[in-house]
Amino acid sequence: MPKLILCRHGQSEWNAKNLFTGWADVKLSKQGIEEAQSAGKKIYGNQIEIDIAFTSLLTRALETTQYILAGSDQQWIPVYKSWRLNERHYGGLQGLNKDDARKKWGEDQVHQWRRSYDVRPPRESEEQREAYLKNRRYQHIDHRMMPYCESLKDTLERVVPFWTDHISQHLLDDKTVLVSAHGNSIRALIKYLEGLSEEDIVGYEIKTGAPLVYELTDDLVVKDKYYL
């Protein structure tokens, strides 16, 4: 039976400081490391054998993947990394304190940017974009595909093709797959997997460092789901 494990990265340093993160590359906090280690132990304790893992290009997800595989004694499995699993790009909000953003733009506007399905935040500056284009981790990507900012809908539109072309192919081979990613890239996958409405998915909360297991039928219909 195909099995999918979705795990949002552990708490990051910027999560702890209440900052918009997006594509900004930050490490796990001490609490985040403990969450990721705990996730690995839960997978080990439930005797789940992972065949392959997918993660983003951002350090907090990469670290979470490493801690999960170490904690479950499966460091040797193949791990594939893709920018398509990156967090939603928060554009000009990245690096800003969320409370300060509310004071500047108002509670309603910030809530709309954060929780609407198809509303984008302000674009990042050309200087910010130039820094991303020069970053070695993104050198292999067509720069025309690099976002200035994203809505949840935009995030879904880059995540689902990666699911179809890569992740789902291993599940169709009856494998157990780990996806260690981010709140919004995982939210996009959940919307697609469960067929949730736009209204339902924007309010869907995803815990940090908590493995969410999907048991799937042979044609990848959700049979059961549960947190470890």
UniProtKB/Swiss-Prot annotation:
Origin superkingdom: Bacteria
Gene3D superfamilies recorded: Phosphoglycerate mutase-like
Active site: H9, E87
Entry keyword annotation includes Isomerase: yes
Any one GO molecular function term: phosphoglycerate mutase activity
Entries under CDD domains matching the protein: HP_PGM_like
UniProt pathway: Carbohydrate degradation; glycolysis; pyruvate from D-glyceraldehyde 3-phosphate: step 3/5
Keywords: Gluconeogenesis, Glycolysis, Isomerase
Binding positions for substrate per the UniProt entry: 8-15, 21-22, 60, 87-90, 98, 114-115, 183-184
Classification via SMART domains: PGAM
Record has Isomerase as a keyword: yes
EC class (word): isomerase
SUPFAM superfamilies, alphabetized: Phosphoglycerate mutase-like
InterPro entries linked to this entry: His_Pase_superF_clade-1, His_PPase_superfam, PG/BPGM_mutase_AS, Phosphogly_mut1
One GO term of the biological process aspect: gluconeogenesis
Record PANTHER family: PHOSPHOGLYCERATE MUTASE (PTHR11931)
Identification of the protein by name: 2,3-bisphosphoglycerate-dependent phosphoglycerate mutase
Organism: Staphylococcus epidermidis (strain ATCC 35984 / DSM 28319 / BCRC 17069 / CCUG 31568 / BM 3577 / RP62A)
Gene coding for it: gpmA
